From Swiss-Prot:
Binding site for Fe cation: H189, H268
Origin organism lineage: Bacteria, Pseudomonadati, Pseudomonadota, Gammaproteobacteria, Pseudomonadales
SUPFAM superfamilies, alphabetized: Clavaminate synthase-like
Subunit structure: Monomer.
Name of this protein: 2-oxoglutarate-dependent ethylene/succinate-forming enzyme
Entry GO MF terms: 2-oxoglutarate oxygenase/decarboxylase (ethylene-forming) activity; dioxygenase activity; metal ion binding
Miscellaneous comment as given in the Swiss-Prot or TrEMBL entry: A dual-circuit mechanism has been proposed in P.syringae pv phaseolicola for the complete reaction, in which the binding of L-arginine and 2-oxoglutarate in a Schiff-base structure generates a common intermediate for the two reactions.
Organism the protein comes from: Pseudomonas savastanoi pv. glycinea (Pseudomonas syringae pv. glycinea)
Pathway it works in: Alkene biosynthesis; ethylene biosynthesis via 2-oxoglutarate
Gene name for this UniProt entry: efe
Length: 350
């Protein structure tokens, strides 16, 4: 795909006529292509390159060191090639996941909430580069969500009310070169959250599936449905050409849920290339305690409790990880039931 629509975001979203028009254009681009690009400025480019450089340096470290950057409290940290599973098959990137970085003194960590804890950073340079980059991505995420709300003729803070102290996180990826027996990077899937903003180097390997009229898409948030592996070998899949000076943006499962399918979560997969490839996928997310709800069916009782949804998705992807074992052993899921009850009470006003 060489003709992705590319947009320039305003420095501030106020709700003016130009913002509303841009919001409509973003929605139309997603509905047509499933993805679009946003222009980046020189400062954003610098922070992108610093994060990529830190990732490359980390990936050169010995496996014994990288494998020590894990935690039984949080899914932050190193994921070895082949550890992650999509549709029952291993994926092959090396990944460093950066979730919310919470000290052991944080009340949520002390209470034993699942997925909460400090990031097992490999070094200070890596920590600074990734946090700085994520802060920049977060600013773009807030503007994109405000524009999306305006495009749907909704109050400007419809989505950003959910993202206060959001569970924003990032997957920092290195894909190995393909071999005569290995070409799969990551299997076909949709992303579980609200909004995905991605950066990649010049190698290329990302493929997305645009909306297809009449095609049934599984609702990844339902226990009996999964988008993993769907349409993996069925066209159309379109190659996302690496382009300097842009980030790519596409919707996740929660945007599909909240908009009643007016926006579809974009299926994507990665094929290995002849050279190693580096990329970052940032997820701009609701608060861990928040519940998402259908925007255009106010009578619908269905909710997605974000903390439960995130925990379920990561436990499914990493069934053998020390974090998953700890959640099960220490019955940390019980805390989610209490959080859900509180969230439901706030949502209904009772």
């Amino acid at each position: 795909m060489t003709n992705l629509q590319t947009f320039e975001l305003p420095t501030e979203v106020t709700g003016c006529a130009a913002d509303i028009s841009l919001g409509r254009a973003l929605i139309q681009a997603w509905q047509k292509d499933g993805i679009f690009q946003i222009k980046t400025d020189s400062e954003q480019d610098r922070k992108t390159q610093e994060a990529m450089a830190a990732s490359k340096q980390f990936c050169k470290e010995p496996l014994t060191f990288k494998s020590s950057c894990v935690s039984d409290l949080t899914y932050s940290g190193y994921v070895a090639s082949g550890e992650e599973v999509t549709a029952g098959k291993p994926d092959f990137p090396e990944i460093f996941t950066v979730c919310k970085d919470l000290s052991v003194g944080d009340q949520r960590v002390k209470a034993g909430w699942p997925c909460h804890g400090p990031v097992p950073w490999p070094n200070n340079t890596y920590q600074k580069s990734m946090k700085t980059f994520m802060e920049e991505l977060g600013l773009a995420g807030e503007r994109l969500l405000k524009l999306t709300a305006l495009g749907f003729e909704l109050p400007i803070n419809t989505f950003t009310d959910l993202t206060r102290d959001g569970w924003h996180h990032m997957r920092v990826l290195r894909f190995p070169p393909q071999t005569s027996t290995l070409s799969r990077g990551i299997g076909a899937h949709t992303d579980y959250g609200l909004l995905v903003i991605a950066a990649q180097d010049d190698v290329g390997g990302l493929y997305i599936r645009p909306p297809v009229e009449g095609e049934k898409r599984n609702r990844n948030w339902l226990p009996g449905e999964s988008s993993a592996g769907m349409f993996e070998h069925d066209e159309p899949w379109t190659f996302v050409t690496p382009t300097p000076g842009v980030w790519t943006v596409f919707p996740g499962d929660i945007l599909q849920f909240m908009t009643g399918g007016q926006l579809l979560s974009t299926p994507h997969k990665v094929k290995l290339n002849t050279r190693e490839r580096f990329a970052c996928a940032y997820f701009h997310e609701p608060n861990f305690e928040a519940s998402a709800y259908p925007l255009f069916e106010p009578s619908a009782n269905e909710r997605i409790h974000y903390g439960e949804h995130f925990t379920n998705m990561f436990m499914r992807c990493y069934p053998d990880r020390i974090t998953t074992q700890s959640i099960n052993k220490e019955n940390r899921l019980a805390h989610l039931e209490d959080l859900k009850k509180y969230s439901d009470t706030r949502a209904t006003g009772s």
